[in-house]
């Protein structure tokens, strides 16, 4: 498929408001993609690589601006790109306004597509893969050169969507649900079969190709693969009354203040994945050793990595973040902060045939299998199954006395649904719920804080899942050291500045507390946080897993009850 054809479909989709029409257009795109279907299924969502892939593009805004300005000719520099971006707020619109192939500088907005259409979808994918592979001395220059080469071949429309793609901001209103429904519509397979295949594979391209080439039976035959991560099942806030009214009895567990970890062990290799499916094996060698010595393969285990002191008591969440994703000085940090595995679910376990998927088994059965594959019982969560609210309260009190965060309430009969934040897992905390929000802007501080960012604009994911809506600003709860560290963290993601105001690429997620959620016309979400306060940087989250407007609306509604 020509990249220009993909860009035309993207433009048509972007101009469409109705959800059903979007799905129909995406289905038409998939039907026309031919051998490029796997790539197109990712590109349309703004993804270059499969969600489970360890390959990352690692292109910041400044690198993109440099490549764009070089393709636009000697009369345009990166500052010109930033200035134009400050006016439009859309890197795609800026890229589309440049006369790239002609090397003649800034063109009028809405410029035509006069250049020869030579780019293909597969060619773009190959060049971006080469860009991602660039490493070591001179890699940044190599990335600029490769990206310049792509932009230099682009028409205006192609540049619009290529620029968005490389920065992960496709912004055409296509979320995961639309892609799922489009696969079903394009290849005449049940939506439920597509959903199930996506849950076990986490690969939209693979599922799309399987649906097209082999149909429903092949989708139904897809299963978990040890070594390939799946999305974690998630919990929503709830009460003991909610649980007992809905399920009649609840499985109660301690809620650990740690980082989610998914353990894959095939008998030879142990691989650990974060909640975002990032490989964190190298950062947690003691967990690897524990699994090798105490777990029967093949297995996929869901659990929590928890930092502990010398007595085995839990340390605050911030301590585990000092270990998570660490690539240097791992041995030294291990001496300072030890990490323990607290396993609470089993997705795949040994069987007579080699291995068995357990996603459809009830939680009570999965937990029983978990106990059978982990020799060290202390590493497996304690579960109380009861219909007695007083017993649950006593269990919660014990968990809190032990320094833990609270309790989890789970439906004993529920299957494991990857990526789903449903009503079968409820988290009960003694404190008001916090929100995990994306930093999309900031303001420079004043006085002694004039050299650092002092106020941060917060956004939640929109309903489509590929954009963000503002919900408030936070400046409370950060020390001078935290402000400096957060400013350094955000600096590579700055897109433009206008006086005290800074526009920031969505990249960093903050956990934010608040007193109340109020309706407000001040922010694009229609809501504002009353007395927001910084709690922590969510190192284990990305913008795609931050909280949604839907969750904000639900929490706001709960306040009124």
Swiss-Prot record:
Protein name: DNA ligase
Family statement drawn from the similarity comment of this UniProt entry: Belongs to the ATP-dependent DNA ligase family.
Cofactor: Mg(2+)
Broad EC category: ligase
Active-site residues, Swiss-Prot/TrEMBL: 255
One Pfam short name: DNA_ligase_A_C
UniProt keyword list: ATP-binding, Cell cycle, Cell division, DNA damage, DNA recombination, DNA repair, DNA replication, Ligase, Magnesium, Metal-binding, Nucleotide-binding
Residues the entry annotates as binding ATP: 253, 260, 275, 304, 344, 421, 427
GO molecular function, one term: DNA binding
EC number: 6.5.1.1
Any GO BP annotation: cell division
